[in-house]
């Protein structure tokens, strides 16, 4: 009995399967999440069919070994030549199957976590906080962290040296469509939360908002928003600013990190001129004290909303001055929240203004910022608090750094910048009638340091700060720390 050589059957099956697999490999990039899922299902089905056919073809080859000796001799010459071709086709099909399997896994991963793209700032936020604006669709995860050691100098034992994992932050965003996305920042401070000696740590939502993109000139945002004031309140990632500590002016006068519940608009009037404006719940004047308005922030925690605040910011980057940006912002609003302060119900109209300039040129980074604030009804608040609440406050600082590594190593991606910062601020620049000034809160700071980035996402910092006050003493400190973004 004459038997048909089995490698011919196997070769025909494999050739057909390879041919059928080509259209899947040539599929265009899916346009929607639904398209992507359909492709995954189709490819997975094809993988299963291809694997089953390989097993079936191998089985037929194995069965050919059971043929009679006469049939084997008759088909021997044909088998020898075509077996080589069949084996080659098997290997080729297995390779295509493996590639297809990898593509399916990649598509599945992209359903949850889109492909990583280069970090860059968007809409005034830091690079890591801007990741969701750079994905096509779906989930984005970023973050940053910073840890430091502080050595208190000449404090005569009143304060202790300390080591602190100051912040670990996660940015979680989700792009629903090209027109709607969600972005958020969740912060873990001081390494832990708990009771007793560990209660200094906390977990906070720094911002969480929905963006609605309408037109480059007009877009909307709603939720818990970062107040668009100064440099640091929007970009507080450790690779951005010099030193281990944020500038004191942007802590004492502009109370970074400052966020409130609100709604507003943002966009670009021209490619060089951007704006942001919000209506937010007002500050709570019960928290105002000698150190300023910082403790009046409500941070979206069951915030009083009897009074509203209004904030607007603009930034301009002139074509004639590459690397230069100039901007300013203003906040106004009542802070009394219809509450009684020893039988009185003041409005506590609160104002805060700031202007800033930044210049980046080759290895040079220069920033300067000035801020001024005014608090109405400061006398009523001072009587309520039992301490002087300044009716005016102000602060300013300038800083400069230069990356010196290009002078030593051409085309190096690393960064090493010595820097200098000078700050001056006074949280009681003007006192209400009948109350004394606290000259210890009228301070200036000289700071020098070194900033090293082995890669753009990682920074190592060392700095020394010299404090002085118009009255009394403030200890100096030496700081050493690390920071990272992702």
Q: Model-flagged regions — what are they?
A:
Residues 84, 156-157, 208-213, 241, ...:
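Outer-membrane beta-barrel pore domains
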Residues 22-23, 46, 103, 211, ...:
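A broad helix-preferring feature
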Residues 2-25:
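Gram-negative bacterial Sec-dependent N-terminal signal peptides
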Residues 127-285, 306-322, 397-403, 408, ...:
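Outer membrane beta-barrel
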Residues 287, 292-339:
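Loop-centered beta-sheet repeat module
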Residues 26-144:
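N-terminal periplasmic/intermembrane-space "pro-region" immediately following the signal or transit peptide
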Residues 235-238, 247-254, 290, 303, ...:
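Extracellular/periplasm-exposed beta-strand and loop segments of Gram-negative cell-envelope proteins
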Residues 32-40, 55, 137-142, 169, ...:
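A generic structural signal for ordered secondary structure
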């Amino acid at each position: 009995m004459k038997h048909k050589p089995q490698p011919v059957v196997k070769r025909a099956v494999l050739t057909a399967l390879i041919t059928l697999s080509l259209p899947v490999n040539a599929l265009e990039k899916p346009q929607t999440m639904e398209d992507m899922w359909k492709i995954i299902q189709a490819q997975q089905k094809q993988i299963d069919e291809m694997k089953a056919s390989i097993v079936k073809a191998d089985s037929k080859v194995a069965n050919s070994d059971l043929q009679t000796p006469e049939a084997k001799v008759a088909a021997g010459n044909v088998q020898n030549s075509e077996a080589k071709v069949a084996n080659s086709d098997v290997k080729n099909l297995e390779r295509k199957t493996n590639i297809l399997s990898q593509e399916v896994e990649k598509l599945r991963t992209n359903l949850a976590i889109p492909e990583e793209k280069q970090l860059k700032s968007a809409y005034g936020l830091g690079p890591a906080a801007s990741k969701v604006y750079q994905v096509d669709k779906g989930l984005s995860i970023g973050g940053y962290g910073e840890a430091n050691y502080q050595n208190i100098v000449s404090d005569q034992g009143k304060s202790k040296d300390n080591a602190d994992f100051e912040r670990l932050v996660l940015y979680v965003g989700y792009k629903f469509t090209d027109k709607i996305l969600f972005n958020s920042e969740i912060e873990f401070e001081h390494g832990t939360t708990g009771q007793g000696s560990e209660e200094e740590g906390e977990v906070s939502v720094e911002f969480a908002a929905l963006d609605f993109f309408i037109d480059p000139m007009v877009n909307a945002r709603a939720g818990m928003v970062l107040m668009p004031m100064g440099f640091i309140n929007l970009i507080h990632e450790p690779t951005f600013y010099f030193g281990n500590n944020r500038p004191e002016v942007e802590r004492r006068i502009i109370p970074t990190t400052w966020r409130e519940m609100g709604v507003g608009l943002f966009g670009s009037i021209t490619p060089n001129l951007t704006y942001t404006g919000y209506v937010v719940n007002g500050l709570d004047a019960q928290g105002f004290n000698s150190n300023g308005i910082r403790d009046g922030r409500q941070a979206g925690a069951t915030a009083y909303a009897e009074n509203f605040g209004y904030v607007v910011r603009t930034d301009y980057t002139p074509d004639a001055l590459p690397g230069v940006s100039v901007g300013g912002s203003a906040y106004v609003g009542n802070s009394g929240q219809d509450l009684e302060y020893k039988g009185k119900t003041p409005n506590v109209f609160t104002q805060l203004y700031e202007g800033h300039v930044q210049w980046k040129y080759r290895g040079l980074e220069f920033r300067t910022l000035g801020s001024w604030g005014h608090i109405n009804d400061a006398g009523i608040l001072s009587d309520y608090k039992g301490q002087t609440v300044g009716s005016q406050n102000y602060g300013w600082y300038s800083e400069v750094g230069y990356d010196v590594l290009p002078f030593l190593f051409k085309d190096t991606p690393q960064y090493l910048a010595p820097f200098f910062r000078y700050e001056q601020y006074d949280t009681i620049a003007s006192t209400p009638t009948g109350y004394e000034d606290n000259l210890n809160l009228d301070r200036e700071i000289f700071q020098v340091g070194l900033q090293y980035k082995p890669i753009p996402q990682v920074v190592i910092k060392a700095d020394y700060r010299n404090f002085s006050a118009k009255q009394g003493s403030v200890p100096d400190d030496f700081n050493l720390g690390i920071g990272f973004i992702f």
